[in-house]
Regions:
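Surface-exposed extracytoplasmic segments
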Residues: 1-193
Protein backbone atom coordinates (compact mmCIF):
# COMPACT_ATOMS: atom_id res chain seq x y z
CA UNK A 1 0.00 0.00 0.00
CA UNK A 2 0.92 3.65 -0.11
CA UNK A 3 1.42 5.66 3.03
CA UNK A 4 2.93 9.05 2.30
CA UNK A 5 1.18 10.35 5.39
CA UNK A 6 0.53 8.09 8.35
CA UNK A 7 -2.96 7.25 9.56
CA UNK A 8 -5.03 8.57 6.64
CA UNK A 9 -6.13 5.15 5.39
CA UNK A 10 -6.22 3.63 8.88
CA UNK A 11 -8.13 6.38 10.66
CA UNK A 12 -10.05 8.43 8.09
CA UNK A 13 -10.92 6.33 5.02
CA UNK A 14 -14.10 4.23 5.36
CA UNK A 15 -13.68 0.44 5.48
CA UNK A 16 -15.48 0.09 2.14
CA UNK A 17 -12.81 2.22 0.40
CA UNK A 18 -9.61 1.08 2.16
CA UNK A 19 -8.63 -1.42 -0.56
CA UNK A 20 -9.50 1.06 -3.31
CA UNK A 21 -7.29 3.63 -1.61
CA UNK A 22 -4.35 1.20 -1.58
CA UNK A 23 -4.80 0.50 -5.31
CA UNK A 24 -5.06 4.09 -6.55
CA UNK A 25 -2.55 6.84 -7.24
CA UNK A 26 -2.29 10.06 -5.20
CA UNK A 27 -3.40 11.89 -8.35
CA UNK A 28 -6.91 10.53 -7.67
CA UNK A 29 -7.03 11.42 -3.97
CA UNK A 30 -8.93 14.70 -4.35
CA UNK A 31 -11.62 13.05 -6.46
CA UNK A 32 -12.04 9.83 -4.47
CA UNK A 33 -10.93 10.45 -0.89
CA UNK A 34 -11.02 14.16 -0.06
CA UNK A 35 -14.48 13.70 1.45
CA UNK A 36 -12.93 11.67 4.28
CA UNK A 37 -10.54 14.51 5.15
CA UNK A 38 -13.19 17.24 4.83
CA UNK A 39 -15.65 15.36 7.06
CA UNK A 40 -13.48 13.13 9.27
CA UNK A 41 -15.50 10.50 11.08
CA UNK A 42 -12.72 10.25 13.66
CA UNK A 43 -13.44 13.86 14.72
CA UNK A 44 -17.08 12.87 15.31
CA UNK A 45 -16.04 9.75 17.26
CA UNK A 46 -13.64 11.77 19.43
CA UNK A 47 -16.44 14.24 20.20
CA UNK A 48 -18.87 11.46 21.14
CA UNK A 49 -16.64 8.94 22.90
CA UNK A 50 -13.93 11.05 24.52
CA UNK A 51 -15.86 14.27 25.13
CA UNK A 52 -19.30 12.78 25.88
CA UNK A 53 -21.08 14.12 22.80
CA UNK A 54 -20.13 17.76 23.14
CA UNK A 55 -16.55 17.76 21.95
CA UNK A 56 -14.48 20.55 20.46
CA UNK A 57 -13.40 18.82 17.24
CA UNK A 58 -14.89 20.50 14.15
CA UNK A 59 -16.56 17.77 12.08
CA UNK A 60 -17.36 19.54 8.79
CA UNK A 61 -15.44 21.46 6.12
CA UNK A 62 -12.03 20.46 7.51
CA UNK A 63 -9.96 22.11 4.82
CA UNK A 64 -7.06 22.12 7.30
CA UNK A 65 -7.10 18.31 7.53
CA UNK A 66 -7.54 17.97 3.76
CA UNK A 67 -4.50 20.23 3.32
CA UNK A 68 -2.43 17.78 5.35
CA UNK A 69 -3.64 14.50 3.83
CA UNK A 70 -4.70 15.29 0.22
CA UNK A 71 -2.87 14.23 -1.87
CA UNK A 72 -1.22 11.48 0.17
CA UNK A 73 2.34 12.62 -0.46
CA UNK A 74 5.03 13.64 1.98
CA UNK A 75 5.35 17.39 1.59
CA UNK A 76 8.69 18.94 2.55
CA UNK A 77 9.61 22.63 2.44
CA UNK A 78 13.30 22.66 1.50
CA UNK A 79 13.65 26.42 1.93
CA UNK A 80 13.96 26.11 5.72
CA UNK A 81 16.98 25.51 7.91
CA UNK A 82 17.79 21.89 8.74
CA UNK A 83 15.34 19.87 10.81
CA UNK A 84 16.02 19.19 14.46
CA UNK A 85 16.58 15.51 15.21
CA UNK A 86 15.42 13.24 18.00
CA UNK A 87 17.97 11.50 20.15
CA UNK A 88 17.20 9.74 23.40
CA UNK A 89 15.15 12.51 24.95
CA UNK A 90 16.08 15.96 26.26
CA UNK A 91 17.92 14.60 29.32
CA UNK A 92 19.73 11.66 27.64
CA UNK A 93 23.35 11.67 28.91
CA UNK A 94 25.11 10.91 25.60
CA UNK A 95 22.55 11.46 22.83
CA UNK A 96 20.05 14.19 23.76
CA UNK A 97 17.46 15.54 21.34
CA UNK A 98 18.58 18.55 19.31
CA UNK A 99 17.69 21.82 21.05
CA UNK A 100 14.17 22.82 20.05
CA UNK A 101 13.09 19.32 18.95
CA UNK A 102 9.58 18.34 20.02
CA UNK A 103 7.88 15.03 19.33
CA UNK A 104 4.69 17.10 18.92
CA UNK A 105 6.19 19.14 16.06
CA UNK A 106 4.45 22.48 15.62
CA UNK A 107 2.14 21.77 18.59
CA UNK A 108 5.23 21.48 20.79
CA UNK A 109 6.77 24.69 19.45
CA UNK A 110 9.12 22.93 16.98
CA UNK A 111 8.85 25.27 14.00
CA UNK A 112 10.97 26.36 11.07
CA UNK A 113 10.73 29.47 8.90
CA UNK A 114 9.97 29.07 5.21
CA UNK A 115 11.16 31.50 2.57
CA UNK A 116 8.61 30.29 -0.02
CA UNK A 117 5.27 30.00 1.81
CA UNK A 118 3.26 31.89 4.40
CA UNK A 119 2.68 28.80 6.56
CA UNK A 120 0.92 29.76 9.80
CA UNK A 121 2.05 33.38 9.43
CA UNK A 122 5.49 34.91 8.86
CA UNK A 123 6.60 31.72 7.10
CA UNK A 124 6.24 29.53 10.20
CA UNK A 125 5.91 25.87 9.20
CA UNK A 126 6.06 22.65 11.24
CA UNK A 127 9.55 21.49 12.21
CA UNK A 128 8.43 17.91 11.59
CA UNK A 129 5.38 16.05 10.32
CA UNK A 130 3.41 17.10 8.25
CA UNK A 131 6.41 19.01 6.86
CA UNK A 132 8.36 15.83 6.19
CA UNK A 133 8.58 13.08 8.77
CA UNK A 134 11.44 12.57 11.21
CA UNK A 135 12.17 9.70 13.54
CA UNK A 136 10.70 10.85 16.82
CA UNK A 137 7.71 12.67 15.33
CA UNK A 138 4.71 11.43 17.31
CA UNK A 139 2.36 11.36 14.33
CA UNK A 140 -0.56 9.92 16.31
CA UNK A 141 -0.47 12.73 18.87
CA UNK A 142 0.10 15.38 16.16
CA UNK A 143 -2.81 14.05 14.06
CA UNK A 144 -5.24 13.75 16.99
CA UNK A 145 -4.28 17.23 18.23
CA UNK A 146 -4.89 18.58 14.71
CA UNK A 147 -8.31 16.87 14.62
CA UNK A 148 -9.51 18.41 17.88
CA UNK A 149 -8.00 21.81 17.03
CA UNK A 150 -9.17 24.27 14.39
CA UNK A 151 -6.33 25.24 12.08
CA UNK A 152 -8.67 26.97 9.60
CA UNK A 153 -8.85 30.20 11.55
CA UNK A 154 -6.21 32.84 12.28
CA UNK A 155 -4.81 32.53 14.82
CA UNK A 156 -5.37 28.77 14.94
CA UNK A 157 -7.31 27.33 17.89
CA UNK A 158 -5.02 24.70 19.39
CA UNK A 159 -6.45 22.17 21.84
CA UNK A 160 -4.34 19.53 23.46
CA UNK A 161 -1.93 17.98 23.10
CA UNK A 162 -3.95 14.82 22.79
CA UNK A 163 -3.07 11.32 21.71
CA UNK A 164 -2.19 7.80 22.71
CA UNK A 165 -0.04 8.46 25.84
CA UNK A 166 3.08 6.97 24.22
CA UNK A 167 5.54 9.83 24.59
CA UNK A 168 8.93 8.33 23.75
CA UNK A 169 10.70 5.53 21.92
CA UNK A 170 12.16 2.79 24.10
CA UNK A 171 15.62 3.18 22.48
CA UNK A 172 17.45 6.39 21.52
CA UNK A 173 17.49 7.39 17.84
CA UNK A 174 20.82 7.94 16.08
CA UNK A 175 21.73 11.36 14.73
CA UNK A 176 23.75 9.90 11.85
CA UNK A 177 22.60 7.69 9.00
CA UNK A 178 20.62 5.41 9.20
CA UNK A 179 19.11 7.45 12.12
CA UNK A 180 16.90 4.59 13.32
CA UNK A 181 17.87 2.92 16.57
CA UNK A 182 19.18 -0.63 16.65
CA UNK A 183 16.28 -3.08 16.24
CA UNK A 184 15.10 -5.15 19.18
CA UNK A 185 16.29 -8.74 19.34
CA UNK A 186 13.34 -10.78 18.10
CA UNK A 187 14.45 -13.97 19.82
CA UNK A 188 15.77 -12.83 23.19
CA UNK A 189 13.83 -9.89 24.50
CA UNK A 190 12.08 -8.58 27.55
CA UNK A 191 9.03 -6.37 27.79
CA UNK A 192 9.19 -3.00 29.45
CA UNK A 193 6.70 -2.55 32.24
Amino acid sequence: GRQGNPLFNEALVAIADKDLYSRTSPTQDAQLFQKYALTPELAHLLNVIVFGGNGPAPEMNRTDIAGIFIPDLIKVDLSTAGARLAGGGPAHPTDPDDAGFSRLGIFGGDVLVSTVQAGFGNGVVPGGWPNGRRFGDDVVDIAVTALISDLRVSPPIIRGPAGDNVDHNDVAYNKVFPYESTPQNGRNHTHNN
